[in-house]
């Protein structure tokens, strides 16, 4: 799973990336385009269930699910026409499965802000900033859709019914984009396989699912968000788009990223919060794409495996090894909650009949602890 961290220059993208990866790989500087080529980093998905199983088994190896993040260059007006690093920026987004849009929600006169409002110079306006990036993605999509629409309209004139059908919904989509609305909020026909195939081919940038990472000040973490005038605006926008808005102080997260687990716990207790903004962001990113984890356990290794929600047992087994799917016989399944309720007494779980035998049609649930039986 690949997620692109995007935003206007100087909103905290590289600082957030450094915190996510606990590195200083991304140059964080107060000027546009300090990121040119995207930095990438593999980030583990926090999972207390996996941590507990590893503790119980005293396992030799613990392997979490992962997310790959890309720190993508800052965007400026005109990127869809190649301004700034526009073409590279848009190409890098196209390669990602989803977008983490970092939005500035703090005041600091020392930080340059690239997008200016003639009526409010150097002002902080997260909705304006969101619209600035959305517009460039929408314009890039409109060009792609218009080109395809022109070809299909031409083919439709020859009596090609499939082309005529495609031209119909493409025209509606083009009109939607022309209205300044992203493709992610367009009413696609999810039951139309032909439409799905075209959408995949088009690779629409503004159709990619998005999480808004609201970069707030440290004072907002200490005093709560009640006094922050910007976060509620982004949260409302996210609700309209069926997206998520997560408050995070990128600089603070970067400062504690290299701390020990004990130090992080002490920090959270001092701040009066349950989890870091990074943990919330990583989990939200994982869920954004409809992903879940099933678990395998044992002394040799405890591991979280990533699958799409709705995956059946044989295909889940195939994530471990293709032979597991090819020779699938059955799966021995324990729900993590049942294991937890039994104080991780495996014998008690089995004696109560809570270890289930499931076949090829079983749909794997998040947190299932599974042993696969196969024969090839």
Language-model features and meaning:
Residues 2-6, 11, 17, 151-365, ...:
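C-terminal-of-GTPase-core extension/linker across diverse P-loop GTPases
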Residues 75-81, 121-124, 131-137, 156-162, ...:
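Flexible beta-alpha connector loops of hexameric P-loop NTPases
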Residues 1-121, 127, 134, 151-152:
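Conserved G1/Walker A P-loop phosphate-binding module
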Residues 142-149:
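Conserved phosphoryl-transfer catalytic core
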Residues 105, 139-142:
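Alpha-helix boundary/capping and short turn/kink residues
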Residues 121, 138-140, 178-182:
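Non-catalytic accessory segments flanking P-loop/AAA+ NTPase cores
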């Amino acid at each position: 799973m690949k997620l692109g961290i995007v935003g206007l220059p100087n909103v905290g993208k590289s600082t957030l990336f450094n915190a996510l990866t606990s590195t200083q790989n991304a140059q964080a500087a107060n000027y546009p385009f300090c990121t040119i080529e995207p930095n990438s980093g593999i980030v583990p998905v926090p999972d207390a269930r996996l941590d507990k199983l590893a503790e119980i088994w005293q396992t030799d190896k613990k392997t979490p699910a992962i997310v790959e993040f890309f720190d993508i260059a800052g965007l400026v007006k005109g990127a869809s026409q190649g301004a700034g690093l526009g073409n590279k920026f848009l190409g890098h987004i196209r390669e990602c499965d989803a977008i983490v849009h970092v939005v500035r929600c703090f005041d600091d006169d020392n930080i340059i802000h690239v997008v200016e409002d003639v009526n409010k110079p150097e002002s902080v306006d997260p909705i304006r900033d969101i619209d600035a990036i959305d517009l460039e993605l929408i314009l890039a999509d409109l060009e792609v859709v218009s080109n395809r629409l022109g070809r299909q309209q031409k083919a439709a004139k020859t009596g090609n019914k499939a082309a005529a059908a495609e031209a119909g919904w493409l025209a509606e989509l083009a009109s939607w984009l022309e209205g300044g609305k992203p493709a992610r909020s367009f009413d696609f026909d999810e039951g139309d396989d032909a439409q799905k195939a075209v959408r995949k081919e088009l690779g629409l940038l503004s159709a990619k699912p998005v999480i808004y990472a609201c970069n707030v000040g440290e004072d907002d973490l200490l005093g709560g968000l009640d006094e922050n005038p910007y976060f509620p605006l982004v949260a409302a926008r996210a609700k309209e788009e069926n997206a998520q808005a997560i408050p995070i102080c990128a600089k603070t997260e970067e400062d504690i990223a290299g701390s020990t687990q004990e130090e992080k716990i002490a920090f959270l207790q001092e701040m009066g919060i349950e989890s870091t903004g990074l943990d919330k962001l990583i989990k939200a990113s994982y869920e954004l794409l409809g992903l879940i984890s099933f678990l395998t356990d044992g002394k040799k290794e405890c591991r979280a495996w990533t699958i799409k929600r709705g995956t059946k047992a044989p295909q889940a087994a195939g994530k471990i090894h293709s032979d597991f799917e090819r020779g699938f016989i059955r799966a021995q399944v324990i729900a993590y909650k049942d294991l937890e309720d039994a104080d991780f007494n495996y014998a008690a779980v089995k004696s109560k009949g809570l270890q289930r035998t499931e076949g090829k049609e079983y749909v794997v649930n998040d947190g299932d602890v599974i042993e696969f039986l196969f024969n090839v």
